[in-house]
Amino acid sequence: MPHRDVSPAASENEFDISNLLFKGQDDLSDLERPSKKRKPQETLILDVMGDGDDGADGDEEFIAAQQTAANRKASNLRGRTVKKGGGFQSLGLNAALLKAITRKGFSVPTPIQRKTIPLVLDDQDVVGMARTGSGKTAAFVIPMIEKLKSHSAKFGSRALILSPSRELALQTLKVVKELGRGTDLKSVLLVGGDSLEEQFEYMASNPDIIIATPGRFLHLKVEMSLDLSSIRYVVFDEADRLFEMGFATQLTEILHGLPSSRQTLLFSATLPKSLVEFARAGLQEPILIRLDAESKISPDLQNAFFTVKSSEKEGALLHVLHEVIKIPTGETEALKRAKEEVKHSKKRKRSEVTSNSHKESPTEHSTIIFTATKHHVDYLTSILRTSGFAVSYAYGSLDQTARKIEVQNFRDGITHILVVTDVAARGIDIPILSNVINYDFPSQPKIFVHRVGRTARAGKTGWSYSLIRESDTPYLLDLQLFLGRPLILGRGSGQQLNYAENVVVGSLPRDKVARYTEWMTKLLDEDVDIELQREVAIKGEKLYMRTRNSASGESAKRAKAVVESAEWMMVHPLFNDESSRLEEQREKMLARVGGYKPQETIFEISGRRGANHHPPDDSDDANELRDFDGENDNAIAADNMSLASDSELEVTFSYPQSGKSNSKKDTNHPNLRESFHNPEYFMSYTPASNSLAEDRAYGVHSGSNTNFVESSRIATMDLAGDESTSRGFGEPRSIMRWDKRQKKYVSRRNDEDGSKGGKSDLLVRGESGVKIAASFRSGRFDAWKKGKRIGRMPRVGEAEAPGLGSGMPGGKKYRHRKEQAPKTPDKFRGDYEKKKKKLEAAKQRETEKAFDPSSGAKKAAVTSRGKSELKTVEDIRKARKVKELRKQKNARPSKKGKGR
């Protein structure tokens, strides 16, 4: 058979078919993607038979042309959305799930999804630290749908997702419905406030996925005696909030009923100690997933620390907002644009600020202010709104919907300032943030890192401003040692400072702060509500100060010398351009006057004036006591300075030295005793080497990354509560309370174990040994089964019984046949005339129907569909029984017996 020559003409669609002989990934993707028509590529025509004279040269030209085409494709695809190698396609998901992910709008997995999904598909327990908005919901929903695949005909649920609130559970259900659209998986929502009977029906329909709050799910577990042995996949969403809201007892009881072969996932914004203990008890060799960006301070973040007095703290905050950050007062640009859009739009909006807010983003003035308690949040919000700022606020006990609205306003740029507590800000993720203000200085360096980690992201610069009182100085020194940066007080250095690499401390300009302090004093005198909020905030701060973590002993010793130094009250170098030399001298004089302490007590003054009100030996005792205190103070101050000088601390903590130099330094020290141990036989309690690689090699675990205990030790961070409840600032001080019924003091434990009386307060021990409410077993499920005529529910592993239920609403729709007159149109709407014509037409149809003789038969036919008029055997039996009872009651003979 003779060979055919290659046709010099291009294909019908002007595509060179010779490329198909050398199929590559780029060529196939180019075929699938519609593109513009191009000219025939004459350089790519291939001589298949090799009849050409330049065989080797042709191959080289062909290869070069292919490479040029590939480079051209890559350059043309820049800036377009393409399927990347690191996308969801590389995770090994099925086609239906990939289609649902694409329909949802996800193209590339987020960092938490990229790290979590492969581990979950590998059947490993995971503890993920992720904030709200980081894509954590899809991180556990996508592998769950991939593993469950389709509905199981065997009875028993296979996945359980526990959420702290109803709103979060609804969001999770929405994501599960959207991503599981291509499957026949059944999912149910079990939250408080819904009908128990409906939830009995949902559970009887054999759902695959249960999304619930812990309280209601435990109620159903006890009431229905649920067997959870079929559950393979458990998720604790927002686990830190689960523990904060008091669900620890319910979680322990639920965890006890789950099989040991389950896979458990735990997602949290922070990692408290109680959560670490729960994870160690309930998870099997968990892996901690933590994004590095959340644990480090950005090198682009610049820090400023301002020393203030307690009475000037509000004025200092107003000065920072007005003069340093320069936040404008009044309505924001985003709010003005939203109002303009509402004004020019034809349809009336329910909310003025939500018309086009999703296109906005935080501005360069966006600032988060961190406070200690929820009372400080209310107090500062009132002050700042009175000052004219656009403010949002959030704290732990704020309603979920209100919190979402407030945070969304800040994200959209409608407000410039967000006042929050550490507990409320734990799961908030702001994409672009310029400034962070620590109104109350954090008690742990980790909390400081957690706060300021929200700014200076993605290569952008940011600022953090902290207000430091004298009582906060030890915590500031702890932070300085934690960061390993030198401490600079005031303007002592006299050189250009780098605020990103140094801890620079100084005061604010006194005259400017005084103006805002006077304004605050006037406001407190005029506004009674703000004055009351201030008193409540002071009381809350006292409780907070009692329960916050204490600073290290060395920092407490060093803090006294730092506060008493002259540089402590010097103006911060940030205000170098504002104050002149004369102003600096004025500041020094005011600082000396402010720190003045009299040398004599009232006893010496009275003795010098010749007063005889006190015995003469009182002044001698006072003199001796004062001299002794002075000697003690001088000795302690000298001892403190010798133990912890600035240079020694910088050398020790910022720049660690090798063991050889330390040994030389120690041998030259005169106060150290000589060591008599023999190095050949002596075994020290400290490791001989500091090699991290050597420690990993000797370790019995597979690696430090998989060792949850070691990883969680670094990530653990306890946040103090933001309100004075028993779960917020610690246990109540008194362990007794007054019982009105018994007329005596009783132990508070009675409130916890249910022994204070009343059936509603009784507690019983569950399967795990913890006490749960006795009202969980009320018999309503038995009554529901009796009403539905269900003898026995199928057991786990048996085939599901048909007709038990259809799961969540969404099956057969109810058809409403009720005819209702249209509403009276609103005169102020733009479509008033249109609605008015509709109303008149409806009235005309109703009038015609009333005078139409055929409409009655039609109406009768419609109503006859609802209820049959034929009586059943049971109806006839009941009617006869009622008639017989009526006869006996009346005691009259029948009409037939009258004629006899």
Swiss-Prot record:
<dbReference type="Pfam" id="PF00271">
    <property type="entry name" value="Helicase_C"/>
</dbReference>
<dbReference type="GO" id="GO:0006364">
    <property type="term" value="P:rRNA processing"/>
</dbReference>
<keyword id="KW-0694">RNA-binding</keyword>
<keyword id="KW-0067">ATP-binding</keyword>
<dbReference type="InterPro" id="IPR014014">
    <property type="entry name" value="RNA_helicase_DEAD_Q_motif"/>
</dbReference>
<dbReference type="InterPro" id="IPR050079">
    <property type="entry name" value="DEAD_box_RNA_helicase"/>
</dbReference>
<feature type="compositionally biased region" description="Basic residues">
    <location>
        <begin position="878"/>
        <end position="900"/>
    </location>
</feature>
<keyword id="KW-0698">rRNA processing</keyword>
<dbReference type="GO" id="GO:0005524">
    <property type="term" value="F:ATP binding"/>
</dbReference>
<dbReference type="InterPro" id="IPR000629">
    <property type="entry name" value="RNA-helicase_DEAD-box_CS"/>
</dbReference>
<feature type="binding site">
    <location>
        <begin position="130"/>
        <end position="137"/>
    </location>
    <ligand>
        <name>ATP</name>
    </ligand>
</feature>
<keyword id="KW-0539">Nucleus</keyword>
<dbReference type="GO" id="GO:0005829">
    <property type="term" value="C:cytosol"/>
</dbReference>
<feature type="region of interest" description="Disordered">
    <location>
        <begin position="793"/>
        <end position="900"/>
    </location>
</feature>
<dbReference type="GO" id="GO:0005730">
    <property type="term" value="C:nucleolus"/>
</dbReference>
<dbReference type="InterPro" id="IPR033517">
    <property type="entry name" value="DDX54/DBP10_DEAD-box_helicase"/>
</dbReference>
<dbReference type="InterPro" id="IPR011545">
    <property type="entry name" value="DEAD/DEAH_box_helicase_dom"/>
</dbReference>
<feature type="compositionally biased region" description="Basic and acidic residues">
    <location>
        <begin position="819"/>
        <end position="851"/>
    </location>
</feature>
<dbReference type="Pfam" id="PF08147">
    <property type="entry name" value="DBP10CT"/>
</dbReference>
<feature type="short sequence motif" description="Q motif">
    <location>
        <begin position="86"/>
        <end position="114"/>
    </location>
</feature>
<dbReference type="InterPro" id="IPR027417">
    <property type="entry name" value="P-loop_NTPase"/>
</dbReference>
<dbReference type="GO" id="GO:0016887">
    <property type="term" value="F:ATP hydrolysis activity"/>
</dbReference>
<keyword id="KW-0690">Ribosome biogenesis</keyword>
<feature type="region of interest" description="Disordered">
    <location>
        <begin position="606"/>
        <end position="628"/>
    </location>
</feature>
<feature type="domain" description="Helicase ATP-binding">
    <location>
        <begin position="117"/>
        <end position="289"/>
    </location>
</feature>
<dbReference type="InterPro" id="IPR001650">
    <property type="entry name" value="Helicase_C-like"/>
</dbReference>
<keyword id="KW-0347">Helicase</keyword>
<feature type="short sequence motif" description="DEAD box">
    <location>
        <begin position="237"/>
        <end position="240"/>
    </location>
</feature>
<feature type="region of interest" description="Disordered">
    <location>
        <begin position="337"/>
        <end position="366"/>
    </location>
</feature>
<comment type="similarity">
    <text>Belongs to the DEAD box helicase family. DDX54/DBP10 subfamily.</text>
</comment>
<dbReference type="Pfam" id="PF00270">
    <property type="entry name" value="DEAD"/>
</dbReference>
<keyword id="KW-0378">Hydrolase</keyword>
<dbReference type="GO" id="GO:0003723">
    <property type="term" value="F:RNA binding"/>
</dbReference>
<feature type="compositionally biased region" description="Basic and acidic residues">
    <location>
        <begin position="866"/>
        <end position="877"/>
    </location>
</feature>
<feature type="compositionally biased region" description="Basic and acidic residues">
    <location>
        <begin position="748"/>
        <end position="762"/>
    </location>
</feature>
<feature type="region of interest" description="Disordered">
    <location>
        <begin position="740"/>
        <end position="762"/>
    </location>
</feature>
<comment type="function">
    <text>ATP-binding RNA helicase involved in the biogenesis of 60S ribosomal subunits and is required for the normal formation of 25S and 5.8S rRNAs.</text>
</comment>
<protein>
    <recommendedName>
        <fullName>ATP-dependent RNA helicase DBP10</fullName>
        <ecNumber>3.6.4.13</ecNumber>
    </recommendedName>
</protein>
<dbReference type="GO" id="GO:0003724">
    <property type="term" value="F:RNA helicase activity"/>
</dbReference>
<keyword id="KW-0547">Nucleotide-binding</keyword>
<dbReference type="InterPro" id="IPR014001">
    <property type="entry name" value="Helicase_ATP-bd"/>
</dbReference>
<dbReference type="InterPro" id="IPR012541">
    <property type="entry name" value="DBP10_C"/>
</dbReference>
